[in-house]
Structures are given as C-alpha cells and as structure tokens.
Amino acid sequence: GDSSSRAKALARAVADGRVLELSVYSPSMKRHVPVRVLVPADRSMPRPTLYLLNGAGGGEGTGHWFEQTDIVDFVADKNVNVVVPMRGAYSYYTDWLKVDPVLGRNKWTTFLTSELPPLIDRKLNTTGVNAIAGISMAGTSSLSLAEAAPQLYRAVASYSGCADTSTNLGRLAIRAVVEGRGGGDIANIWGPVGSPGWRAHDPVVNAYKLRGRAIYISTGTGVPGPHDQLQGQGIDGKTTIYIDQIAVGGAIEAATHQCTLNLDRRLKQLGIPATVDYA
C-alpha cells in the first residue's frame, strides 16, 4: 500500500494498543534511544522477538520500516514482538572505537546485544527466542550482530545488505553511507581502513559463527526493475529521485549483489545452510 494506508495501519495498531513507544536509556552511549515496538494482539502467552533494524537513516527520516513497508499489517496475525530502534543513522549499528565529531558516540552492538534485550524480555514477557533482521546498511549489521552474539539470536536476515566490510567493495559501501551521506569519518568505526578491526567485523570472514542459525539473505541485481519507472511508488514523476534511484540505488544494489555472492560462496564452503534470494 501507499504511505497513507501505512499511516492508517499504524494508527489502527496504536488504537488497538499494539504499538509501544519506548525511550530506552543506553549507559554505553549515555543517551536515550527511541524504540518502537509492535506487540501481538494476543499477549496471553510469551512470544519470540524480532529485532528489526532500519537502513542508513536509522529511522530518523522517512526511510524506515513503518513508512516504507507494510510491516504493521504483515505482523498483525503473527505471534511475535517486533522491536525497532528509531535512531542510529549512518552508524552501521556497531560499536565505534572513537566518538565521531559529526555522528557522535555509537555503541550499538553493546546496546542491541546487552542493554536492550534484557529490558524487552522483562517488559514484554518474551520466550527469550530472538531473531534479527536489517535492510541496506543494517543488513550488514544484522549479520555482524548475529556473529557477535550467536547465543542471542536463533535466526538472522539481511535485505539488500553488503556482507563484506574488509574488501574494497565492502569498504566502498561503508564509505558511501558513513562519509557520503552521514558526514562521518570511517576511521572512527573500527580504526584506519585496513586495520584488523575491519576484518574482525566482516560478516563473510566470520560466517562460521552463523552455524546453527536460520539464515535468510536477499538482494537485487541493480538492473532497473518494474518499479523503477518515473511513475513508480515513491518516485511520482520526480526526475531527480528517479535518477538517484537508478544510478545510486542501482549501483548500491549491484554492489550488494556481489557481496551476497561472496557470502553465499563462503557459507557453502562452510556447509552452513542459508536461503539466498537473488530477486
């Protein structure tokens, strides 16, 4: 549906008491993080939890799950809690080595694996069974977080994310997001480019840590598809958006396609089953 129908779906869910707007203090980041939670209509039993991460904008603009997808309607009949942090733009949802002059203090691995889950488990009476998924920038993050805390997540999904961080292609993708869009300095993430921290956080290098998890990965090819037309959803005849979607979006999707091939190959070498969808 379009954004007005999505807004209505969200309003209905709010009215039904299915949406919780939390403000969660992060000791590691020394600030409050807004977290939007979708709970099932039937809360009589403990439920599993899906941690769903927004793309590059971190949910701070309109490019987030609630604005761009039918997530509210999609999970309405699923017996699952959905937890969406609404901050973290251009952070890659990782623990940064240094405070960035533009992007500030980012300790998202700590927040998402240590600080937030115990609070969610207590507040929502969960089963303690978790999954994590992310799109675009956060597709990389979801894989990395699942490797950082394998005992925490039963399943992981990455949509249009580049799994590499220590290859030229992976670094290019991170630079495009953090520096190109966020104005930050990528050396503040894991140290200077090429330093050991970059390999230590590379989901392809560390893919063996995903063993035993349910894994879903999807990517496009970067070739313009049926929605990439001037009248397509979210474009509405605006030429600059169209050019941006084809040139920038296409290039990013082509890069994530190659990254996904790399991850797919690595998982096969390791004998780790995964569902990989080349849309």
Task: Show where each model-derived region lies.
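Non-catalytic cap/lid and distal C-terminal segments of serine-dependent acyl enzymes
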Residues: G1-A279
